[in-house]
Amino acid sequence: MKNIMRNKEVKLFAVIFAVFIASMMLFATTAHAATVTTKNMPSKSVCVGSSKTLAKPNVSGFKWKAINNTYYTLTTAGKLTGKKVGTASFSVTCKNVKYVYKVTVKNRPKLNCTSKTIRVTEKLNLKVLNAGNSTVIWTYKNPKVVYDGVGYGPGTTTATARCAGVTMTCKVTVKDYNGSLAKKMAPKANANVLSAFDKLGFKIKYDPTVNYGGCFNAHERTITLRFVGDNTIYHEMGHFLAFVAGNVDRSSDFAAIYNSEKSKFTGINRSYATQNATEYFAESYHDYILQPTETKKKLPKTCSAISDAVKKVTPTRVARVKEIYGPFWK
């Protein structure tokens, strides 16, 4: 009888234990499913035919999975490659978190042209098509030929645009300006001064690599400027005027004017402009052209000297300058 009771107890215990184990397994399964959460990750974009490597979230054990859908492919190394324009999401589950990524595939950016010819001081006007809201970064191989999208000097160079992971290039040829560059870039200067500049064979050059704003060189017959469109050209034209009028900035008469009125000069380049009579004459010409009324009021003697210098630039004077300096000019 005791054996029968013991067998029943054993069987009952076995049934209870089995039910307990089953319930624990069910609870464990239910609890695991309930703790999975979804986390939307920052959207990604890629262009058709382009690739980028996605950065993993800072989660231990996270691994990319291989995906090949209509719009893009993803490798286990995280390399995302665009196939067709469109949008699709994928997810990766790691440690009870479902990471969801929305991927948009866009048209590949391209330049509006792959070769272009412009002249010095002209804008390149290249455009990136299909750029959308993506940032475009421009670089130019030779800044002495093209700088900041503007022709700076004759020659050939390459313009490069980088946008949305795509690199595009355009061959650019820059030719000399067809006409008087002095008249184009310093249109407010005195007509006879500009005419003398051209007749004596002087040239304007641009070089963004120099460490100064402008430089007049009578021996080389050049005005070198750092930036296209800078009003510094009027300062350098002041140097040219002084030279062609007979180096009037170095005369004793102008030295007396310089000493009497330099303290009245209030331009933004005051320290540089008043260091000597030569720079004072050039910068005063700059103001004489661009701010005539104010400058004549503040510096009457200086402006009178500049006006006299302008009057000296006659065809006869130009011919004389050419006769004297011609043998030294190449």
List the predicted regions and their residue ranges.
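Active-site-flanking segments in enzyme catalytic domains
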Residues: 187, 191-330
